[in-house]
Amino acid sequence: FAAVPRLVVTGPSDGENVEGNSIEIAGFTDKDAKLTINEQPIIVNDRGEFKENVLLQKGINAIKISSTNRFEKSASETFNIKSNYQTPELANIESEGKVSGDEDARKSGVSVIVRAESVPTWLSVEADGNLIYSGTMLPGAIQNFDGEKEVRVTSGKANQTFVRVNGKAEKKLADDPGIVRDVVFTIGD
C-alpha cells in the first residue's frame, strides 16, 4: 500500500489578490516526486522544496499544483489568484500619440512582448546575457521584456508562444509544439 505524496504549498493562499502580473508559488513535496504547476513540470530540489514564478493574466487565474510519486499516487491543490494587472498592449493603446523621452530611449533597444496562447507554457528569457525571467505563463498572460542589444527566449511550448518584436506584428515563436531554445531577437528584428 503506497501513500499519496505530501504536498504543502506555503504561498500563495487561495483567493489572493495581486496588483502585478506574476506570483511566486512555493512549497515542498516528497523529494523524488514529479511536481507540475498547470501541467508544466517544475524542478524540486533535493529537500523536496520548490519555488516557481507564474505569469498571470488579468482577472481570476486558476493554478493547479500536482505532485505524483513513483507509484503514480498523486496529491493536488488548486488556487484561484486574482490579478488586477493591465497588459502592455492596453497600456500602449491608452498612451498612443503621446511621445516621451523614455519611449524614444527604449526604441534604441530591443522590446519583445510575449503571450501564452491556450495552455500554460514554461518560459525562460534572457536580456543581454542576463536571465530576467524563468517561470510558467498562464494562458492569455502577456509580458514585456526589454534589452539593450538582444532578448533571448526559450519556450517549453513554442507553438503556443507568440512574440511581438519591436512593435511589429505578432508571430508564433515556432511551429514546433515542443521546446525551442535560445531564439534571439535583436534591434534589427
Task: Show where each model-derived region lies.
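Ser/Thr-rich low-complexity repeats and stalk/linker segments
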Residues: F1-Q86
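Extracytoplasmic/periplasm-facing segments of secreted or lipoprotein envelope proteins
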Residues: G15-N17, N92-I142
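Intrinsically disordered, low-complexity Ser/Thr-rich linker and spacer segments
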Residues: V18, N84-S108, L173-D189
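Short proline/glycine-enriched turn/loop motifs at strand-loop junctions of beta-rich domains
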Residues: A26-K34, A116-T121, K157-Q160
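Exposed beta-strand face motif in extracellular beta-rich ectodomains
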Residues: G59-I63, V110, V151
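Extracytoplasmic
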Residues: S124-E126, N130-S134, L138-D189
